[in-house]
Every structure is written in C-alpha cells, then in structure tokens.
Amino acid sequence: MDRDLEQALDRAENIIEIAQQRPPRRRYSPRAGKTLQEKLYDIYVEECGKEPEDPQELRSNVNLLEKLVRRESLPCLLVNLYPGNQGYSVMLQREDGSFAETIRLPYEERALLDYLDAEELPPALGDVLDKASVNIFHSGCVIVEVRDYRQSSNMQPPGYQSRHILLRPTMQTLAHDVKMMTRDGQKWSQEDKLQLESQLILATAEPLCLDPSVAVACTANRLLYNKQKMNTDPMKRCLQRYSWPSVKPQQEQSDCPPPPELRVSTSGQKEERKVGQPCELNIAKAGSCVDTWKGRPCDLAVPSEVDVEKLAKGYQSVTAADPQLPVWPAQEVEDPFGFALEAGCQAWDTKPSIMQSFNDPLLCGKIRPRKKARQKSQKSPWQPFPDDHSACLRPGSETDAGRAVSQAQESVQSKVKGPGKMSHSSSGPASVSQLSSWKTPEQPDPVWVQSSVSGKGEKHPPPRTQLPSSSGKISSGNSFPPQQAGSPLKPAAPAAAASAAPSHSQKPSVPLIQASRPCPAAQPPTKFIKIAPAIQLRTGSTGLKAINVEGPVQGAQALGSSFKPVQAPGSGAPAPAGISGSDLQSSGGPLPDARPGAVQASSPAPLQFFLNTPEGLRPLTLLQVPQGSAVLTGPQQQSHQLVSLQQLQQPTAAHPPQPGPQGSALGLSTQGQAFPAQQLLKVNPTRARSGLQPQPQPAVLSLLGSAQVPQQGVQLPSVLRQQQPQPQPPKLQLQPQWQPKPRQEQPQSQQQQPQHIQLQTQQLRVLQQPQHIQLQTQQLRVLQQPVFLATGAVQIVQPHPGVQVGSQLVDQRKEGKPTPPAP
C-alpha cells in the first residue's frame, strides 16, 4: 500500500510539471459560448507558450483573472480596505462605470472577510447582488476586486493595491437562488424546485474527473496546497496580531488620560508645593524632652467598689459531655483523708494499683505520681485486658511515687534489710480473678487455703472460687493451676541476708503483696485483695504459718487477737525461720504442709490510721493484714517483717476446710527479735481521734495491719481480742501494694451478710519527708467507713532453727527494665 501511494505521488508531480510547461489545447463547440473556466484555461495556455526556457526567469502564467478582466472589462464587486479604524466597505458598479458604496462594516465584523479568504460567495449578499443594476454574475461566480488602502495611505493621492478573487457559489447560495427564482408569482411544486436546483448545480459545477487512479486525488491535493499554503491557521493568527482589531485597544488605552488617583506628580511639582509652606523646626535641648502622652494630665478616680462578676470573663472548660470528645465512663475519685499540710511540705498523692498476671501468681503493681490535688479529679476506670500478661512490678526509687512510699515505710516501720525493686509498667495486666455480677445466693461459699509439703508431692486441684460482692451479687474468680502457682524456692544463708541491709543513705523499697483487682465491668464498691504466701522448707518443724486471705467480710467491729512473744535466737528459744528478700526468685512456689482454716468475724467498719507528730505530718503506711496478729521488727533493722500468728479457732466457723488456690511466698528475711510482752491497741471507734500512749514495746494491730514504731505502742480493748496460744510464729516479710478504693455507703441490710476472707486496700496519700526521723509520739486518727474486711490464718510447719528459706527476687535496682518472673 505504501509503495502504491508513493507511485501515485510521483505521478501527481509529473502531471503538474507537464501541465505547467506544456498544457494541452482544448477544442470547444462552435455553437455555444465559452464559460468563465474555459476563458481562464485559454489564457493560461497562451501564457504557458510565452514561458521562457530558462526557469530562472519570471513566469507569465499567473494572475489569470486580472488579465481576463482587463481583456473583457467584466463587471465585478469592489471591496475597499481602509486604514485605521475606518473599516471596510462593499461597492457595486453602476451602468456608467462608477461605484456606489452599499455596505460599510468595521473590522471587528469579520464574517464577510472570512468568505473572501475562503473564495466563497456569501449568502448575505445574494439579495444585494440581485438588485444591482449591473449583472456581476459570471457562470454563477462573482469576481471581486479588493483594493487595499492600508499600506499606501501616506501617498498623495492615496494609492492602493488591487487583486482579484473569484467567489464560487456554494450550496447555500444555490438554495437561495432557487428560492428567489420561485417568487415570480407562479406555483412551483416541490418536484419543480428540485429539478431547478439540479440544473443549477450542473451548470455551475466544475468538470469532474472520474478516473479511479489515486494520482488524481494526489494531484488535486497538491494544487490546493500550493494555493493555500500561506492561508493556514497559524499564519492567520500571526497576521491578526497586527490587524486593526488587535491594535485598536492598545491605541485607545494610550490615548486616554490616566485617572486622577493614578497620576504621578513629578519632583518639580512637589517642590513647587513646598515653596509656600513655612517650616517650623524646633530643636529641644537635651533632657528637656517630654513625651506627649506624659505631658497630658491624668486624673483617674479610684473606684470604691468593683463588680468583679461583670468584668470577669469565664471560659467554659472542656468536659466529657463535649460531643467533639470521646465519651469515656468516668469515675470520680476523691481523697477521703484529711491531712493538714505544713509550710515546706510537698504533698504526693499516689494511686497504686495492685493486680496479678496470668503467667505468674506474683502480684503486679503500678504506682504513678499525681499532681497536687486541690479539687476532685475525674479518672477513667481501669480496664483489664485478658491478653495482657505483664511482668510483676517492683517498687524502687526510680520514680517519685516509689520514693515517697519507700520513705513512708522507713519512717513508720522498721528499716528494710533486703531491699527490693519495683519497675513501672505502662500497661495494666489483667486480673486473675475477674469479678462479674451474678444472682444473689442465700449462703456464699467461703474461700480456703491449699498448701502442699515439699517432698511429699501432695497436690490438690484448685477449685473455682466465688466471692460475694458488696452489692449482694456473686463474683467468680479463677485460681491458678498448681503448675503455674508453684515453683521451687532457693534457700539462702542468714549471712547473705544480713549483708544485704542498705545503709542510711540508701532509700528502702516497698515490698510486694499479692492481690487481685476486680473487673471494672461489675464495679463493686469493695476491692478484693488476695494474699497467698507459699513457703518451701528443707526440714519440717512446727510453728510456721502460711497466710491465704481473700473474700469480703461485712461488719463494723474491729477484731484483735493475741500472740505469744517471739524470742531472739540469742535468748535460748528457737528462732523463727526468716525469709530473705534477696532470695525471692519467683512469684510462686509449692506450699508446705499447711492445715487450712477459715475465720469469720463481724466488723462494722474498717479503721484507718494516720500519723501526726508535733514536728508535722509524718508518712504512715497503712496495711490490712489477716486477722492473725502481725508484728514488725525493731528500729535497728531496715527490713519489714510480718510474724504469722497462731491459728485462730473460732467456734462459730460454719464451713469445713476445703482446698484453696496456691500462692507465692512473699517476704524478706530478717533477724529475730524478742517481744517479751504483748501490747494491745486501745481504740474508740465512735471517736474521730484517739491518743496513743508511748510504750517501750512493739505494737500489735490485728485487723488493718501492724505498724511498729520505736518506743511506742497501741492497745485494743480486750473485748475485741481473740487469743489462741501457739508455740512460735514464723517471720514473714509483708510486701504491700496499694489500690484506690472509692468511698461508697453500704446499706445496713448488706452489712449482715455472711463474712468471708478478704483483705481491703485503702488509698494512701503520702508526704515526702526525710528518711531518718526518730518518732517519739503518735496521734492516731480513726475513721470509720462501711467496707468489707476479713482476715484469716492457718498453721503450717515451722523449719528447723537457723535455716532460712525463701524465694529470691532476681531483678536488681540498677536494671532499667524488670525481668518477668519464671512461670
């Protein structure tokens, strides 16, 4: 196909070259006259015969229409192009040869000019040309003479450049002619009109070439290209840039004067204006210049009263009810304790959270320092996630909250011998016993302690424990399986525990206590804490106890129980087994041979103690321990000791012993100290305050814990005490974790529910004070609050004297990240 097209193009070039050099002569019929096209062809043949052989010379076979008009004096249509904004005009020739102007148009109306460029007869001129006195049609075409006065306007007389254009009819003009011819008053049918139109087309159309060769089309395209090569759209745009419609707006803008606001005054005009204006220049002396605003008199009357409410502007604080913020279930927490602050004392409000992970029975805690609370704060409730298994937390001096709690333990209780660490966790681990509300039972099930003796291999499957909530509904808790709750503990020598005692410059750390936090979905007013220490012994003996307490107790009466004095190893009596804090390695271990027991007592309200000395408020750590008496060590040691009391036998026990969940052994080893006499706490529940009488022996507090201070003692009424003789109690270190509890009133009907074993935690606000302060006197503040408390103790085997066993805490204070306990 490409080859045929190339051959057709070559043939078209040859045809054009032959036609330009030697066009053939035509033969016409002698009867008919020649048409306009035939006349033009004859002139072309004549001019080609005169063509010189030298191609460099000029050709004469051009401008054929001008030569035809000069030869035959054919009438034509005259179009004048005037310079400037004069526009153009159309003139018709009269019979005497003069021209009369018919139409004058500006250059902006380019419709007629576009028809002239296309060499087409405009349909709008049909009526004008038909009414002309001279027939200007030649074979249906019109010859137009264009006189251009724009380039020779400066000549006198003005000259012009002339060229002729042949306007050929189009289908529009033929339709217009048919319409004009049928207006003669006769009736023309549609067929007659179509026949007339066909005759006009045949008469005015050029001869057709019906040769199927492609060379014919290529020849016609080449001739049209040579004729319209300078009449392209880009060339038209370039020429219109210098046409009058484009130049006229520019000239009009240059001729118009600018508006007065935009006129620029010259420098001479400015100087002329300044000539008549006097200039007053006053230069003041140095030091005598006074500002204008200072020189003005200012007499302001001081108002006697000011309405602050009208002048003050209040800003609405963003609340949880704002639709733009996500609405979270908020829980209002307020400080139930009324501390009096002194000058220079920095108040710290800590809200510890005690919880237990799934992979380890050792308790996890999180202590966060809060800002100074001047008003009630709203806080979103803590939501546990069952998939979160965080490692246990260890209190330490890395944060202010841990340091405040450590100083509170140091100033009130004995000094720590084996310090432990606490690392803060950003995510709250899930509670082991997630409480959910169920139907209220008639008699709630009690909770019992399960223990096993090392070496015998006796294990019991942990039963499902149900704890009654304060609202009267049952909450179920899942205990640990035996393989997760117990792990072997490494014994340690007493010398290693004694060498681990920190100096006075070191800050003691807070021990851990095992607890479980309830699920926030149920939101019971009472928080549930579980203490389940497990001790593994090499040699079996009597007197050692493991404490496992959980469950609520309803009542309003404080309980107290006595204990037998513990003698130091040097006094001849067998020393109790110590548990070293440095040996606390894992969070759980198998329990020794322990006999479970349950103690139920009625307590109307818990007792909350606060310490106030003449020097000011001193930090005091409140603990809630089992119902057995608990004694802390003397002032010369820095370790916390918890002495488990003898098993209490309560005649009103209504439930038999059942196997309970295993716990972990918690505690730090300390040296035994003799307690020759028993001291009782004297409490008046009806009063808001009661004095403490300083005594030279340590104090015993059975319900909420024991806080021993050098040279001090407190005493309980004998009516509230329950005594049970035992050979010798062991020494266990208490590791407390604190958990906030909201104050809620309980109805009297709920206070008569059966009692269960439970340890209640309270929110403590600690004041940061120096560590080494000798406390001589204490003032005890007792607050009554309807909560649920219970304690319990069971007797286990006491180890051989001189043997210390325990679990070692692997995490050290210098480590930045806590090591998760072994499962």
Curated annotation (Swiss-Prot):
One MF annotation (Gene Ontology) recorded for this entry: transcription coregulator activity
Region (Disordered): 246-273, 369-524, 560-601, 631-669, 720-757
Polar residues composition bias: residue spans: 423-440
Compositional bias of kind Low complexity: 469-509, 568-582, 636-650
Gene Ontology biological process terms in this record: regulation of transcription by RNA polymerase II
Gene Ontology cellular component list: SAGA complex
Highest taxon in the source lineage: Eukaryota
Similarity remark: Belongs to the SPT20 family.
Name by which UniProt lists this protein: Transcription factor SPT20 homolog-like 1
Biological source species: Homo sapiens (Human)
Lineage of producing organism: Eukaryota, Metazoa, Chordata, Craniata, Vertebrata
